[in-house]
Amino acid sequence: SPEAPVHFLVIPKEHIKSANYITKENSHIIAHIFEVINKITSELGISEDGYRIINNCGKLGGQTVDHLHFHVLGGRELKWPPG
């Protein structure tokens, strides 16, 4: 369920299990993900005020899906710690 007024996921098509599996060979995918995030946050009008990018890595980091993905949250003030 959404954690903020704006909450979307960015998921690479190529399978990368987690951030632990980012390599020199696939790092271009990560660069593309951040280009996509920049484009979408700008289109949604949240880039100026700010947003949060979340990636959970490993069991203790809260990762429940074995495919790298990023949550992007914005549209309100985001507190810390998140939970």
Task: Tell where the protein language model's regions lie, with residue ranges.
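HIT superfamily nucleotide-processing domains
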Residues: S1-G83
